[in-house]
Amino acid sequence: MKILITAFDPFGGEKKNPALEAIKLLPEQIKNHQITKLEIPTVFHKSSDKIADKLKAEHFDAVIAIGQAGGRYNLTPERVGINIDDARIPDNENNQPIDIPIQQDGAPAYFSNLPVKKMTQAIKDAGIPAALSNTAGTFVCNHILYQLGYLQATRYPDIKFGFIHVPFIPEQVVDKPDKPSMALSSIVTGLEAAIGAISEDNQDIKEALGEIQ
């Protein structure tokens, strides 16, 4: 499969984005998958426009966006993107939408059509902490996951799409003693495992990975 992997530039005052640093280290081939990497801006709509332009220019079987989730200690494949922008902080062009639908004619939510449970388990099997997440937030990460679902629903019915959040890396938490981090090499290992779990048949595993609350 041809898979497009995207990651955001640094945002929120950070000098680095672990998602971007991690995809730079991914190999160009993971199992049977040919990997293409794309940096996108942490900017509402402009980020998804850049992906849309790439999809117009080149065919891909799947798109996986990677983003930073400072405060999480594990890798978290996301189950669903919701149709709302509600930004607690401005994006990198000082946009701060509050309670604004991402697409007026879009569904309330789009579920990733990747085998997210299989991917989560593959990360764990590689020795990296992971959990299936049911919320991608309401900032640009959720925005991108939702926009990928919208693109699949309206333009590219055969494309697979998803999102994985990654923690801070250690250098980002030197002055944040209450925040967890993960070594960049571990993030890369986990992402490789997740991507490697994707197959042509797209079958997921039947296992309870949900949450009580």
Swiss-Prot record:
Protease found in the keyword field: yes
Catalytic activity: Release of an N-terminal pyroglutamyl group from a polypeptide, the second amino acid generally not being Pro
Keywords, alphabetical: Cytoplasm, Hydrolase, Protease, Thiol protease
Gene Ontology molecular functions: pyroglutamyl-peptidase activity
GO cellular component, one term: cytosol
Subcellular location: Cytoplasm
UniProt GO BP: proteolysis
Disulfide bonds: none
Record: active site: E78, C141, H165
Domain of life, per lineage: Bacteria
InterPro entries: Peptidase_C15 (IPR000816), Peptidase_C15-like (IPR016125), Peptidase_C15-like_sf (IPR036440), PGP-I_bact-type (IPR029762), PGPEP1_Cys_AS (IPR033694), PGPEP1_Glu_AS (IPR033693)
UniProt-listed Enzyme Commission number(s): 3.4.19.3
PROSITE patterns, A to Z: PYRASE_CYS, PYRASE_GLU
NCBIfam families associated with the record: PRK13197.1, pyro_pdase
Summary of subunit composition and partner proteins: Homotetramer.
Family: Belongs to the peptidase C15 family.
Protein name listed in UniProt: Pyrrolidone-carboxylate peptidase
Lineage per the UniProt record: Bacteria, Bacillati, Bacillota, Bacilli, Bacillales
Gene from which the chain derives: pcp
